[in-house]
């Protein structure tokens, strides 16, 4: 996990709690596309033969011996190489065999209910980009301020609420959590009596944050090495089941493309 969980001794931890100009992190500075991260996808798509791009379908089964993928309309596609970037726990669903099911069940992760909220006015917090809320009495653990990042004139933010991997998040749960969220934002002083919710949307991240341990990491590596022999590769933050940045994912994809092109 490298820089995401760097080694730190007690003095370093205490020092990082202070207003210290020398305190830095792996993402202290960064470059970001002017038109958003979607511009990467658009550039790649524009360079492809669009007749070979199939959208609006879902893979439901993979035959790794005969190198075929079955789609949700019953059609089958023969492949030379198969590169997966979808979450590994979902990807394992496409294979038949107890070993795939066992690995799937062993994977640990959480789900996150995300609210995107738009209000009629700014908050008193005008410089913060995100905050962690270490309070069990509050239903969310992290919030972020889109408006402060974009220098907008109305409060817009995201809220993250954690769940276990086996938890079922119903519509009723979403409504309850939205009500609690607004109450807690008010209690924390982030919104006031004059602040009104104008727009909101909901996203359920499943999985959200993967949990890495020695045993499952070993089994994942064995799966990846075995399936590489069948020309199947699984990469990306969720496909490789790891912690990484967008840059890491892009480099991994570039390295794999160069490797396969050289074969």
Language-model features: where?
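Active-site/ligand-binding neighborhood in enzyme catalytic cores
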Residues: 1-67, 85
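Mid-domain catalytic core of redox enzymes
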Residues: 57-175, 180-190, 217-226
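Charged, often glycine-rich, active-site loop that binds/positions anionic groups
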Residues: 208-219
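A conserved FAD-binding loop/helix module that cradles the flavin
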Residues: 238-260
